[in-house]
Design a protein with these regions (language model features):
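Surface-exposed repetitive/solenoidal architectures
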Residues: 1-205
Length: 205
């Protein structure tokens, strides 16, 4: 991903991908300025792990003011599936995802897994998110920071478990009032977290 380090991408118009064979951006480590524009009709039918509009966001990556809508579906034992990023080491700010995301483990509307250096701030989601475990309206597996985010997701799982792992979480002013079905390391904001979750709101359907 060295091509993107220090580079800035600016989105100046809305983009409709309904007629485009799009496979996701493999690696990105630059600045992506969405300008409040929408990339719509993203359709990813993937095999294997680590998939999203961006598969990997590096430590120096900053994605701001971007709206994405579409459907991301996976086959087999796929992990780290997200609407915006499969794996996030960077910063995702003021972004949103609307649509459908499904996978096996670590599945979220914004990111599948948010690594220790990852920051997801002031993001919004309105999606149906389905996985076997580690399922979240914002992030499936959070190891970093999730702050000031709002989820209006429907969270689903096909496997029942009676406990939830939230070890090490700083809940802050988290407000959870949403819809969660068959809890199995899943939640309206994050599925499982060893990081920080602060000032988030779940208004799930």
């Amino acid at each position: 991903d060295s091509w993107s380090v220090g580079k800035t991408v600016k989105l100046t118009h809305n983009i409709d991908l309904s007629k485009v064979d799009f496979n996701g951006v493999a690696y990105f480590s630059g600045d992506f300025e969405g300008g409040g524009h929408t990339i719509s009709n993203v359709k990813l039918q993937v095999k294997g792990s680590d998939h999203g509009f961006f598969r990997y966001l590096g430590k120096s990556a900053v994605v701001n003011d971007l709206k994405i809508s579409g459907k991301i579906t996976s086959e087999g034992s796929c992990k780290n599936i997200g609407g915006i990023a499969g794996v996030n080491y960077g910063t995702i700010g003021n972004c949103s995802f609307e649509g459908t995301v499904n996978g096996k483990t670590a599945v979220g509307a914004i990111a599948g897994i948010n690594k220790p250096t990852g920051k997801i701030v002031n993001c919004r989601s309105n999606a149906t998110v389905t996985a076997t475990n580690q399922t979240g309206g914002i992030v499936g597996n959070n190891e970093g920071l999730v702050s000031e985010c709002t989820s209006e997701c429907s969270i689903n799982t096909d496997e029942l478990k009676t406990t939830m792992d939230i070890g090490g979480v700083d809940i802050g002013t988290l407000n959870l009032t949403g819809r969660v079905i068959d809890r199995n390391d899943m939640g309206g904001i994050v599925g499982v977290s060893t990081g920080i979750v602060s000032e988030c709101i779940n208004q799930g359907k």
